[in-house]
Amino acid sequence: MQAACWYVLLLLQPTVYLVTCANLTNGGKSELLKSGSSKSTLKHIWTESSKDLSISRLLSQTFRGKENDTDLDLRYDTPEPYSEQDLWDWLRNSTDLQEPRPRAKRRPIVKTGKFKKMFGWGDFHSNIKTVKLNLLITGKIVDHGNGTFSVYFRHNSTGQGNVSVSLVPPTKIVEFDLAQQTVIDAKDSKSFNCRIEYEKVDKATKNTLCNYDPSKTCYQEQTQSHVSWLCSKPFKVICIYISFYSTDYKLVQKVCPDYNYHSDTPYFPSG
């Protein structure tokens, strides 16, 4: 009966079997399992009672009651004692290994529109020299690629005279009438959407030698100005309109840049 009981315990509950054998071998050591906290029980079993609880001794005592008496000598090194902090660290590390690694964040792909060509400062310039005035106007056009573009002008003059630089539709008539220089027809207002974004004018005066008579001193006025226009769709073609008036010289000029140069669709003038 005793042997049958041992076999049942061995097959059903191996843990209970080991504890029972430990009690049969040395009854005094069973107090280690009853006293003390649950956290330090494992540490006491594998340190103080390592000789009495060796696996080779437990197995040999178990198989001696059988007909074929066999002693098994299994080497088992006593493990090093672990502190409570070591056990917590081990549990924390094992938990971290099981957690899935976060996916690397990919940078969003920004689809940028195809930027069109632009006119630089050297692509447009107007240089006017008279006896009493020296004028230089440069400009550039920048297409922002989002349906808008900017037009910049720089004006530098020395002498006396009136200069006007503006943007007009291609249907603007070239004429000397000052009253009609800034007038835009109603039919062109839908295709011409431009406004002044920035404007600055600096003036200074100085006395220099006269151009017509170097032996005399003339009063000259220097003017520097910067202006920028912002245009947006819908638009077709813009033209640069320059009007210059002086005591000895008059000039009205309209310059329309090649629209095919900075646009995907060709422009066909009408009217």
UniProtKB/Swiss-Prot annotation:
GO biological process, one term: modulation of chemical synaptic transmission
Tissue: Brain, only in a scattered subpopulation of neurons that probably represent inhibitory interneurons.
Region described as IV (linker domain): spans on this chain: 177-185
Top-level taxon of the source organism: Eukaryota
Signal peptide interval: 1-21
Post-translational modification comment from the UniProt entry: May be proteolytically processed at the boundary between the N-terminal non-conserved and the central conserved domain in neuron-like cells.
Main subcellular localisation: secreted
Metal-binding among keywords: no
Subcellular location: Secreted
Region II, residue ranges: 22-97
Keywords: Glycoprotein, Secreted, Signal
List of glycosylated residues: 23, 68, 93, 146, 156, 162
Annotated region (III), positions in chain: 98-176
A GO cellular component entry from the record: GABA-ergic synapse
Keyword Signal: yes
Biological role: May be signaling molecules that resemble neuropeptides. Ligand for alpha-neurexins.
PANTHER family referenced in this protein's UniProt entry, alphabetically: NEUREXOPHILIN, NEUREXOPHILIN-1
Family assignment from sequence similarity: Belongs to the neurexophilin family.
Name of the featured protein: Neurexophilin-1
Organism: Mus musculus
